[in-house]
């Protein structure tokens, strides 16, 4: 769980104010969000939420990087998605009031915004713009999960790395992500299920094809369209 929590309304207003869905709310709904939500600092490798727990919050990554995954008793994991800054997740489980179906772990030290389920449901019923935003989220997330399963089962390692990176640049789910992403080879390994050494070889191959450039704990994308289709032709 989180190490610290921020409830200061002025700070929360600054954080929530950068998101389009919040900007589109009426003033009363904005006050409800600020008055009931919090920001949580989550350290590297810490758990924000666990599978099987009640889905009592809708989450947004203000900065850092989270992964959504399932772990078994031996520690093996299956990663569904990484969530970079600007990404919101968990709306499906909150709407259905079901227990969370995946674990949420911080790959990087992260600042996460938490909106209570009751507030989320109020916004759904009172704000047409918010309802449209959530529907878009659900559609995009479903496509992302299907692609993740396809990638893990059908793609070779180089293509898995490329597609895991490409998912972090979905403009509808992650509008805050620019073409320079702060992520290390080890962190990308957490998302792909590959070793750091294998990720390194894949990134070198992508760099040789001028799709990206590597720097220390940073990757700059040179050709996003090529990254998105890399390795998909055999499918």
Segment roles from a protein language model:
Residues 1-44, 93-94:
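Cyclic nucleotide-binding regulatory module and flanking cytosolic helices
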Residues 1-12, 92, 141, 160, ...:
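Long cytosolic regulatory regions associated with cyclic-nucleotide signaling
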Residues 21, 46-108:
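Cyclic nucleotide-binding regulatory domains
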Residues 30, 120-121, 227:
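A generic structural signal for short hydrophobic patches within well-formed alpha-helices
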Residues 58, 82, 114, 182, ...:
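Short aromatic/basic micro-patch
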Residues 79-139, 143:
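Cyclic-nucleotide recognition modules
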Residues 107, 125-193, 209:
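Polybasic "coupling" helices that flank or enter modular domains
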Residues 168-235:
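Phosphate-/nucleic-acid-contacting segments
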């Amino acid at each position: 769980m989180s190490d610290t929590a921020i409830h200061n309304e002025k700070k929360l207003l600054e954080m929530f104010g950068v998101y389009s869905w919040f900007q589109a709310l009426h003033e009363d709904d904005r006050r409800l969000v600020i008055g009931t939500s919090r920001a949580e600092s989550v350290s590297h490798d810490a758990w924000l939420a666990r599978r099987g727990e009640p889905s009592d919050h809708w989450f947004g990554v203000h900065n850092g990087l989270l992964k959504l995954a399932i772990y078994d008793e031996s520690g093996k994991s299956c990663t569904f998605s990484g969530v970079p800054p600007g990404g919101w997740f968990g709306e499906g489980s909150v709407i259905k009031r079901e227990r969370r179906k995946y674990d949420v772990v911080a790959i990087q030290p992260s600042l996460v915004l938490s909106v209570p389920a009751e507030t989320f449901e109020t916004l759904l019923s009172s704000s047409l713009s918010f309802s449209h935003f959530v529907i878009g989220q659900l559609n995009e997330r479903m496509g992302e999960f299907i692609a993740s399963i396809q990638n893990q089962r059908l793609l070779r390692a180089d293509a898995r790395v490329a597609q895991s990176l490409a998912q972090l640049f979905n403009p509808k789910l992650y509008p805050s992500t620019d073409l320079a992403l702060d992520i290390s080879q080890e962190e990308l390994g957490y998302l792909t299920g590959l070793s750091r050494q294998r990720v390194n070889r894949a990134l070198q191959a992508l760099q040789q094809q001028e799709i990206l450039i590597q720097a220390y704990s940073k990757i700059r994308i040179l050709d996003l369209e090529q990254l998105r289709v890399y390795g998909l032709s055999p499918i």
